[in-house]
Amino acid sequence: MTNIHSTAIVHPAASLGRNVVVGPYSIIGSDVSIGDYTRIGPHVVITGKTVIGCNNQILSGCILGSVPQDLRYIDSELTGLYIGNNNLIRENVTVHRASGNGVTYIGNNNLIMVNCHVAHDCQIRNNIIISNSVSLAGHVIIDSCVIIGGHAGLHQFVHVGALSMIAAMSKIEKNVLPFVVVSGMPAITRTINLVGLKRYGISKTDINYIRLMLENLKVQPLAFDTYSIFKKFKSDNLLKRNVAVQYFSDFLFNSFRARGFIPFKVPKK
């Protein structure tokens, strides 16, 4: 049975599923849809064209689906926010709807901690942990199984590869390669994310291929011909066409065409 606190304001046109809980003083707008068993804490505002799936927990003070901080945004744009299932969104998180007829997207099984900001048009996949006070600028993409440490800041249009880890207080201005650990201001790629790869059951064979690809990128990091390395990945018989290699090489190629990727630490001479 749906339970709406007497002080909450839920627009009659809003769609609430079975056993939804809406806490004290929360406000649910007219274009909002909330799936079964989702719990909304006190003092939460959900507005705009926002769709929230099932079994989510949204704690006090969150503001979801509000107008993007984009000076080009026009009120008539049909933008929205989509949040999947089984997400835990902690206190005072802000998530803005998209601009330019797009959708801000948050997938499934994510933990977004206190005071985080997810800007317009961000795409957050699945099984991601975003620690306290992380700020994602517009159009950031985070692939699945990423961990982001507290107070990190991500530049707009950055793409974070799967199974990577960003250390606390890092400044992310370029793409983060899959399967690595980055840290620093500005960030530097430090090492392979071996703990994360093992945790998600990546095979030893795939880990060895990933190590080999990363070692290739470490060679003369300030002078290598990135396109030649990409072609080597595509043609080298040693790198079999498994999922990890395909994903890494595609990510690398797209990074060359866009923002580039965070470089490796250069050893001191």
Swiss-Prot record:
Listed EC numbers: 2.3.1.129
SS bond partners: none
Record keywords, A-Z: Acyltransferase, Chloroplast, Lipid A biosynthesis, Lipid biosynthesis, Lipid metabolism, Plastid, Repeat, Transferase
Gene Ontology terms: biological process: lipid A biosynthetic process
Reactions this protein catalyses: a (3R)-hydroxyacyl-[ACP] + UDP-N-acetyl-alpha-D-glucosamine = a UDP-3-O-[(3R)-3-hydroxyacyl]-N-acetyl-alpha-D-glucosamine + holo-[ACP]
Signal sequence, start to end: none
GO molecular function: acyl-[acyl-carrier-protein]-UDP-N-acetylglucosamine O-acyltransferase activity
GO cellular component, one term: chloroplast
InterPro entries the record matches: Acetyltransf_C (IPR029098), Hexapep (IPR001451), Hexapep_transf_CS (IPR018357), Lipid_A_LpxA (IPR010137), Trimer_LpxA-like_sf (IPR011004)
Pathway(s) served: Glycolipid biosynthesis; lipid IV(A) biosynthesis; lipid IV(A) from (3R)-3-hydroxytetradecanoyl-[acyl-carrier-protein] and UDP-N-acetyl-alpha-D-glucosamine: step 1/6
Location in or out of the cell: Plastid, Chloroplast
Pfam families per the UniProt record, alphabetical: Acetyltransf_11, Hexapep
Job of this protein: Involved in the biosynthesis of lipid A, a phosphorylated glycolipid that in bacteria anchors the lipopolysaccharide to the outer membrane of the cell. The target for the lipopolysaccharides produced in the chloroplast could either be the cell envelope of the eukaryote or the plastid membrane.
Stated family: Belongs to the transferase hexapeptide repeat family. LpxA subfamily.
UniProt subunit comment: Homotrimer.
Name of the molecule in the record: Acyl-[acyl-carrier-protein]--UDP-N-acetylglucosamine O-acyltransferase
Organism encoding this protein: Cyanidium caldarium (Red alga)
Gene: lpxA
